[in-house]
Design a protein with these regions (language model features):
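N-terminal hydrophobic/helix-forming segments and targeting peptides
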Residues: 1-177
Length: 177
């Protein structure tokens, strides 16, 4: 998770790539709205609307993404995580509806443990926009907490002894007191 740029930001109408969420049952009806070229692109990617599938669809000089989820009307914490992993860096917004609890998986899917080695080909942040501005701060805090725990778990014991754990606890206490 990037420290310098929040991965969840307020939707103020800025440019963003559309994310369409479909399920396997609703996909046949949804795909009828697309052009032949767009349907062919999804067929080439073997996209059927199954959970955690990601498709890229050409749209004139641009494109949009489609993700398979269990229920587009009731998103879970993890249903958009695969999109955050698979899509290129950029700014995204749901085409219909708000991401709701899926902001958690969107953020934590971008976690990279890079304390000892930098990624060979780092991927920039995938920012998700939401109109639910009141939920952003809590969602970011929760994702940061998860990523901190992942860092602690991924740090070898030789670098995370009692003194290092104490220092981490002191840092947290100072930040939140």
């Amino acid at each position: 998770m990037a420290d310098n740029e929040p991965l969840i930001q307020p939707d103020r109408g800025q440019d963003a790539i559309s994310l369409h969420l479909v399920n396997r049952d609703g996909f046949p009806e949804w795909v009828k709205k697309l052009s032949t070229t767009q349907r062919t692109a999804l067929e080439a990617q073997k996209f059927e609307g199954s959970g955690y599938q990601v498709g890229i669809v050409p749209d004139g000089d641009s494109w949009f993404a489609v993700g398979g989820v269990a229920n587009p009307a009731e998103l879970s914490s993890w249903c958009m995580a695969k999109l955050a992993e698979a899509l290129p860096a950029g700014t995204y917004r749901r085409a219909e509806g708000e991401p709701g609890p899926a902001v958690h998986g969107w953020q934590t899917a971008q976690y990279v443990f890079d304390r000892y080695k930098q990624p060979e080909r780092p991927v920039g942040p995938r920012v998700l926009l939401t109109k639910d501005v009141g939920a952003i701060d809590n969602a970011i805090a929760e994702a940061k907490a998860v990523c901190l725990v992942r860092d602690l778990v991924n740090t070898p014991a030789e670098d995370m002894g009692p003194a290092a754990l104490e220092a981490q606890c002191e840092e947290l206490a100072k930040a939140h007191s």
